[in-house]
């Protein structure tokens, strides 16, 4: 039998340690939520990304009449690399402008929008793929990445009204069953973002359980992955662009 003092200590630990761990968990995810829904500038260690942001602003000034603007993380940027053939086949003829940036979180994109990324532009459609890096880089919850998308859509709506500009939100293309990524995807699919905002489930065009067929690392699309999702996205863009007004 344990002495009474040891029993008391054990009881104290059993009562207080879970509460303390719970408080730490809550504080950690509250901070990650803050990073997701508020503008997050690039750090001094992210000089290459800051230079990419400056180049994107220059590209925006050079293409002020682009009818479709692609925003988001590496899946967007790599459309011009691994998916180059698909981009040149389907989206270059439409005059689309791609300002996607690798490693970008929702907070980073909010900061870029605040910093005038889209100031010279008046696109009829914004295509958004953001939040994956919140889960990967910041280890956030799926719900947190979803709230980051809500904040981005709200910010875009401050810049462009629903009467002039549509928004397409693309949920995560690759998500394992039961993962935080799947939670993120489901949150986007179930949410009503409001007037003229469309959630487009392009992951349905990547059938099968073997992600390696469509990716080169289990997350980022390869050429085949981009070839699979480009035609349905192109058709939806055409459908929206054919409307005389929204």
What residues fall within each predicted segment?
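N-terminal secretory targeting modules
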Residues: 1-71, 75-82, 234, 240-241, ...
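Oxyanion-hole/transition-state-stabilizing segment in secreted/luminal serine hydrolases
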Residues: 77-92, 107-150, 155, 166-175
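A short beta-strand-loop structural module common to alpha/beta enzyme folds
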Residues: 93-105
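Second-shell loop/turn segments in exported
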Residues: 97-99, 136-142, 175-177, 215-220
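Catalytic His-Asp segment of secreted/periplasmic serine-dependent ester chemistry enzymes
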Residues: 173-246
């Amino acid at each position: 039998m344990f002495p009474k003092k040891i029993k008391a200590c054990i009881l104290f630990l059993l009562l207080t340690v879970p509460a303390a761990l719970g408080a730490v968990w809550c504080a950690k995810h509250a901070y990650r939520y803050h990073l997701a829904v508020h503008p997050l500038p690039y750090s001094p260690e992210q000089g290459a990304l800051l230079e990419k942001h400056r180049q994107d602003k220059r590209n925006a000034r050079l293409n002020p009449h682009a009818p479709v603007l692609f925003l988001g993380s590496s899946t967007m940027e790599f459309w011009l690399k691994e998916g180059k053939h698909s981009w040149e086949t389907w989206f270059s003829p439409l005059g689309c402008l791609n300002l996607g940036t690798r490693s970008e979180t929702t907070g980073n994109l909010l900061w870029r929008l605040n910093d005038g990324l889209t100031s010279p532009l008046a696109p009829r459609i914004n295509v958004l793929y953001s939040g994956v890096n919140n889960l990967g880089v910041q280890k956030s919850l799926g719900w947190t990445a979803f709230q980051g998308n809500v904040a981005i859509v709200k910010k875009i709506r401050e810049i462009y009204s629903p009467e002039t500009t549509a928004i397409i939100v693309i949920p995560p293309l690759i998500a394992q069953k039961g993962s935080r990524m799947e939670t993120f995807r489901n949150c986007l699919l179930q949410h009503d973002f409001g007037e003229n905002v469309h959630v487009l489930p392009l992951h349905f065009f990547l059938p099968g359980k073997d992600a390696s067929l469509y990716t080169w690392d289990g997350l980022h699309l390869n050429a085949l992955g981009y070839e699979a999702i480009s035609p349905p996205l192109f058709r939806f863009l055409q459908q929206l662009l054919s409307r005389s007004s929204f």
